[in-house]
UniProtKB/Swiss-Prot annotation:
It comes from the Bacteria. One of its GO terms (molecular function) is sequence-specific DNA binding. GO terms for cellular component: cytoplasm. This is Macrodomain Ter protein. One of its GO terms (biological process) is regulation of DNA-templated transcription.
Amino acid sequence: MKYQQLENLESGWKWKYLVKKHREGELITRYIEASAAQEAVDVLLSLENEPVLVNGWIDKHMNPELVNRMKQTIRARRKRHFNAEHQHTRKKSIDLEFIVWQRLAGLAQRRGKTLSETIVQLIEDAENKEKYANKMSSLKLDLQALLGKE
């Protein structure tokens, strides 16, 4: 495993994930009966400051259909948490207008690259174009100077 699991921290993430899903109207318990489900949710809500007990609640009450989705969410959150510790792995965000993002995403898809790789490629293309333009301008001036002397 690449990233260390931190039980207390991850239990808090699991609690937040389950509460968010409950508030969005998803069934987070394995119970069909509404009163049993509500009772289990009430117990979960009372465990906010008891991260160690959250795992027990999950084993006992959680809807089995949520298991894989929650694991994926926690794994992604763990990765972001550890990557945020280092400047070179930390994700940055930029504000793009939707139409700009849409065009960039389309270009990235056509080129078979990620958005970041596409942006780097566009920057390199612009830098190369600038170097080419400077070189051509310099050659043009040299040629004019050479022709002007004769």
